Amino acid sequence: MEVDYNPMDLPVNTVYEDESEFRDLEGTDVKDMCLEAEAIVNDVLFAVGNMFVSKTLPCAVDVAYINVEIKEGTRYCLELTDAGLRVAGYAFDHLAEGLCSQYHETVYSLLDSLSPAYREAFGNALLQRLEALKRDGQS
């Protein structure tokens, strides 16, 4: 393809009309649910039996799926969207059709509703951290 200009001659701050559709996104907090899901897994993995972002179900800017096995042994597939987290299925990588489960704003709230063992593990971790802070403050 021949061009009648040298791209290096274009000014650095050239604004193209095609970019106008992206101006509305400037300054907004656009989330990538895949990254958000990974952060959730890393945050609470200590308090569940197993947890990982699904490699089978779609992971996109607006949705991600997390497989979790609580300490009691029950498995769930969780859906993460802007609305929050909800149980989407009762097996890894499985979405139950017609399931209308409640959305939770945080993974802590969701796991607290599903797993007494999570509640205990989270409480113990919190207590250990507070004791460590107390020891550090007395030193």
From Swiss-Prot:
Subcellular location per UniProt equals: Cytoplasm
Signal sequence residues: none
The yes or no answer to whether the keyword Protein biosynthesis is present is: no
**Cited Pfam families:** GSKIP_dom
Q: Name one GO cellular component term.
A: cytoplasm
Biological process (GO) annotations held by this record are: regulation of canonical Wnt signaling pathway
Listed A to Z, the keywords are: Cytoplasm
InterPro entries in the record: GSKIP (IPR037395), GSKIP_dom (IPR007967), GSKIP_dom_sf (IPR023231)
Top-rank taxon, per record: Eukaryota
- Report the sequence similarity comment from the record: Belongs to the GSKIP family.
Q: Please give the PANTHER family that the UniProt record associates with this protein.
A: GSK3B-INTERACTING PROTEIN (PTHR12490:SF4)
Q: What is this protein called?
A: GSK3-beta interaction protein
This protein's species is: Xenopus tropicalis
Instruction: Please name the taxonomic classification of the source.
Output: Eukaryota, Metazoa, Chordata, Craniata, Vertebrata
- In the UniProt record, the gene name given for this protein reads gskip
